[in-house]
UniProtKB/Swiss-Prot annotation:
Role description: Plays an essential role in viral RNA transcription and replication by forming the heterotrimeric polymerase complex together with PB1 and PB2 subunits. The complex transcribes viral mRNAs by using a unique mechanism called cap-snatching. It consists in the hijacking and cleavage of host capped pre-mRNAs. These short capped RNAs are then used as primers for viral mRNAs. The PB2 subunit is responsible for the binding of the 5' cap of cellular pre-mRNAs which are subsequently cleaved after 10-13 nucleotides by the PA subunit that carries the endonuclease activity.
This protein's name: Polymerase acidic protein
Residues where Mn(2+) 2 binds: E80, D108
Gene field: PA
EC number: 3.1.-.-
Length: 716
């Protein structure tokens, strides 16, 4: 049969059939009848289209190939024979330009005269049986069906045969000739008997041997073999059956499947209440750095040495005082803690040799700030079985918080470029195999786009702080160790730079389990006046500690310097993930890579270079109240990175729940956009599951707001 196909059909048709079989993982050496069927179908599609044009008056005309008028517009667009990605691109383009409804399955042709998609069928069985199978599969009035048989019969939707008698006769003659040629070679009977009904990809996959025996053994009760089960599944009408089963479960269960229409979804309800507050473990856009360039001091690289060197670059220290107290805390203790840090740093400088680490004196203010002796005494359960009113602590429900504009500002800032490089090329990892040449190119392009990004600074800052805190928690369990918050970068000129953001003082840290908490006090420099957005700084006590001279276009100006102080806590598992924040670079690189792969698949060549170097092209970045925001490929890289970084910085059960539940709604909306006519039951239950995750977390509230923008614009 394979030899016959190669002799009987045009080489271009044979090549397209080979590609189609390869795409579905089928072996043409084994599936020879299928190979012949695909070639026949392709040839009929091409013959259907051949010689048919539309003239300037919009009339359909038949023109032979050597006619000088062959530059007229083709009447039919051929979709069959293209790879799936390209075929869907063509279908989408036709739908966008003509307003045609998007089909669920790939059709074979589009008729520009009648403005409809056409599904061509070639059958070795009765035409009406094959027609009904096609119609049952497509379930669309907008796709026209035209079936031909090898016996000269045909059948079409509403008996509308589209083409003139002569064109159809040419197709029937060709099919009859193919049948005769096969019969002469003794191939026809095998070919005729091999046709099955309309198949899905899963049905084409034949299971044999051990896997077949396992499949037969793994069936639900009352099914003797896989064929019976398949026949049952194929004829299964889900809606009524599921409703019937659920109604047996409980009288309260009502699972009527409702159609999901453009008017069905409502916006997610965001909570009311006071504005949400900053809850990250360190300051983000409001952080201020004291920096040294080209560090070459003694002990360079030892955090405490670097910190002292950075502190010496600032000369505007003044007597600190509280400008924004913490509502519930003993604020003088925070002030005394900062004064203690300054005093003990001064003591170090007065020593002959600076130590590598510094353990703070266990003063009353630090004991209070670090919760020393505040934990309730643990009692073994066996010792209190007889206590009649034994119960857990009553815990208050968390207070609902509303979305505040500061979190969107934080995200926007994270997407921006800084004037420093925060990662070297090797942060994402070296090549392992020579095949990774393209991967290297993509990594280098991506690194160039994100190395200056503020989100990348947050990654390196997070990695440093979590590593230092976990080390100290293990090495100095009983000590109140002073940990400088440091990062390293390179300037535009390539000079090394060491930055100090502030200090952490670690509490007692006997961390046996992954979730055991170590308390710490963070003290971070900033130029942001907390009185501008006091709700953001609810958990902080803010001191004014100095005045900083800043150079600007109009000369020097003095700005007050603040210290943001708060008590916080973390655990071994959180620090472990914080140390691995570089994973965010990989995650966003993979997302960009899938975009490149999609583009390369359409163009059938690697598009990495064009993707990054075509500066004129814009890409969708995300939703906003204004609609879909577009930006350069660099902006897309930085936005994806910032999202990944914020997922790490603001990780919480609320985020986990919201991501999982909102994804279900997103998939239903996407199915609606793809014209898949989705149905749902208990949609309000899904909304409840989403909305119970919206409590007080700023990042979750912002994501919910973005989701509402997406709903608004997706369903227009």
């Amino acid at each position: 049969m394979e030899d016959f196909v190669r002799q009987c059909f045009n080489p271009m048709i044979v090549e397209l059939a080979e590609k189609a079989m390869k795409e579905y993982g089928e072996d043409l050496k084994i599936e020879t009848n299928k190979f012949a069927a695909i070639c026949t179908h392709l040839e009929v599609c091409f013959m259907y289209s051949d010689f048919h044009f539309i003239n300037e008056q919009g009339e359909s005309i038949v023109v032979e190939l050597d006619d000088p008028n062959a530059l007229l517009k083709h009447r039919f667009e051929i979709i069959e024979g293209r790879d799936r990605t390209m075929a869907w691109t063509v279908v989408n383009s036709i739908c966008n330009t003509t307003g045609a409804e998007k089909p669920k399955f790939l059709p074979d042709l589009y008729d520009y005269k009648e403005n409809r998609f056409i599904e061509i069928g070639v059958t070795r069985r009765e035409v009406h049986i094959y027609y009904l199978e096609k119609a049952n599969k497509i379930k669309s009035e907008n796709t026209h069906i035209h079936i031909f048989s090898f016996t000269g019969e045909e059948m079409a939707t509403k008996a509308d045969y589209t083409l003139d008698e002569e064109s159809r006769a040419r197709i029937k003659t060709r099919l009859f000739t193919i049948r005769q040629e096969m019969a002469n070679r003794g191939l026809w009977d095998s070919f005729r008997q091999s046709e099955r009904g309309e198949e899905t990809i899963e049905e084409r996959f034949e299971i044999t041997g051990t896997m077949r025996r396992l499949a037969d053994q793994s069936l639900p009760p009352n099914f003797s073999c896989l064929e019976n089960f398949r026949a049952y599944v194929d004829g299964f009408e889900p809606n009524g059956y599921i409703e019937g089963k659920l109604s047996q479960m409980s009288k309260e269960v009502n699972a009527k499947i409702e159609p999901f229409l453009k008017t069905t979804p409502r916006p997610i309800r965001l909570p009311d209440g006071p504005p949400c507050f900053q809850r990250s473990k360190f300051l983000l856009m409001d952080a201020l750095k004291l920096s040294i360039e080209d560090p070459s001091h003694e002990g360079e690289g030892i955090p405490l040495y670097d910190a002292i060197k950075c502190m010496r670059t600032f000369f505007g220290w003044k007597e600190p005082y509280i400008v924004k107290p913490h509502e519930k805390g003993i604020n003088p203790n925070y002030l005394l803690s900062w004064k203690q840090v300054l005093a003990e740093l001064q003591d170090i400088e007065n020593e002959e040799k600076i130590p590598r680490t510094k353990n703070m004196k266990k003063t009353s203010q630090l004991k209070w700030a670090l919760g020393e002796n505040m934990a309730p005494e643990k009692v073994d359960f066996d010792n209190c079985r007889d206590v009649s009113d034994l119960k857990q602590y009553d815990s208050d429900e968390p207070e609902l918080r509303s979305l505040s504009s500061w979190i969107q500002n934080e995200f926007n800032k994270a997407c921006e470029l800084t004037d420093s490089t925060w990662i070297e090329l090797d942060e994402i990892g070296e090549d392992v195999a020579p095949i990774e040449y393209i991967a290297s190119m993509r990594r280098n392009y991506f690194t160039a786009e994100v190395s200056h990004c503020r989100a990348t600074e947050y990654i390196m800052k997070g990695v440093y702080i979590n590593t230092a805190l976990l080390n100290a928690s293990c090495a100095a369990m009983d000590d109140f160790q002073l940990i400088p918050m440091i990062s390293k970068c390179r300037t535009k000129e390539g000079r090394r730079k060491t930055n100090l953001y502030g200090f952490i003082i670690k509490g007692r840290s006997h961390l046996r389990n992954d979730t055991d908490v170590v308390n710490f006090v963070s003290m971070e420099f900033s130029l942001t006046d907390p009185r501008l957005e006091p709700h953001k700084w609810e958990k902080y006590c803010v001191l004014e500690i100095g005045d900083m001279l800043l150079r600007s276009a109009i000369g020097q100006m003095s700005r007050p310097m603040f210290l943001y102080v708060r008590t916080n806590g973390t655990s071994k598992i959180k620090m472990k993930w914080g140390m691995e924040m570089r994973r965010c670079l990989l995650q966003s690189l993979q997302q960009i890579e899938s975009m490149i792969e999609a583009e390369s698949s359409v163009k059938e060549k690697d598009m990495t270079k064009e993707f990054f170097e075509n500066k004129s092209e814009t890409w969708p970045i995300g939703e906003s109240p204004k609609g879909v925001e577009d930006g350069s490929i660099g902006k897309v890289c930085r936005t994806l990175l910032a999202k990944s970084v914020f997922n790490s910085l603001y990780a919480s059960p609320q985020l986990e729940g919201f991501s999982a539940e909102s994804r279900k709604l997103l998939l239903v909306v996407q199915a609606l956009k793809d014209n898949l006519e989705p149905g749902t039951f208990d949609l309000e239950g899904l909304y409840e599951a989403i909305e119970e995750c919206l409590i007080n977390d700023p990042w979750v509230l912002l994501n919910a707001s973005w989701f509402n923008s997406f709903l608004t614009h997706a369903l227009r």
